[in-house]
Structures are given as C-alpha cells and as structure tokens.
Amino acid sequence: IWGALVMKALEEKIVKEGVWLPGNILKVGSFLNHQIDGKFMMELGEEIARLFAQEKIDRILTIETSGIPLAMAASVALGVPMVFAKKNRTSNLSGGLYQTAVHSYTHNTDYTVVVEKQYLPAGERVLLVDDFLANGKALMGLMELVNQAGSQTVGAVAAIEKGFQKGGDLLRSQGLRVEALALIDSMDNGNL
C-alpha cells in the first residue's frame, strides 16, 4: 500500500506542477530535476528499494545531472554507492575511462558520457536510475558502460516513463527489467 501511495503522490505532483512544452517535453523542475523536494525524493528512493528488494544490487549508475537526486535517494535507501556518468571529459578525470555516445531527447544533443573505471568495477550488479525514460537512449548508454565494465545490469528505473515514446518497450524487449514510478501514456495538446 505504501508504494502505491508514493506513486499516486508522484502522479498528483506531475499533474499539478508539471508543465507541458512543445515536442512532448514535460517540465517537472519544481520538484524532480531542478528544485528538489528532498523529503519526497527520499520517499521515491524508498520505493525503488522496495521494488528491487529481491535483487542483489552492488551499485547504482545514472547520468548527470537530472538523474542524480533520484539515484542518490535510491542509493541511500538501498545502502549501496551511486556513480554518475559525466557528460563531459574534465581535466580531473584520471586513469582509464568507460565511454559511450548518448543522445538526449530533451536537449536534442549527443553526448559522450564517461565513467572512471575505478568507480564501475567488474563483476558487479548495477541498477540504472534516471529521472525520465523517453526514447531509452540514456539508459541504453548506461547499459553499454556496464557492459564495458564487465558487470551486469539488473534493472532500470525512471521516475517518469513516457510510454508513448517506446524507449521502455525497447529496453524490455532486450530482457531488461524496467520499472517506472509514474507512466504517461500520452501528452496530447498539453493534456497528460
């Protein structure tokens, strides 16, 4: 029952505070990925921990920047480390890197995301976490990083899945367990 209440609260926040933008963009910056409702974010993290309670998870992986708050909340709830893939190779990165190309639907931009090898060890079971799941490119890129590391992706979770954009279907067709805390079936003329 608790999980259903958290997901219902997320749906209510999306309807009340979400702003529809042209191009099927949903702006939820008031609570999810710009300004953070910390208490609510921790509740979402607890729900992720509940959903994946039967899985052995060694690490959480996300992409900067918008996935970090949710991934951090899940990290705390699961008691495992969280690492984020950087969208830019900075001068303070040392040692070997895993890297892959990712296309951002929201920004319509291609990034080469990187993770230092020391933060994504071989042989681990990794949960992918992101704020949105639209076309699935970000999560597929994260899966590629996990594969490069010689680890296993045990699942993926997004706060919000845009079901009409088929990224979730694509990932599920590859045998990946994908969970969404909220599912949007359509965004016709600003109506969710």
Explain the meaning of each model-derived region.
Residues 1-129, 133-192:
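PRPP-associated nucleotide enzymes
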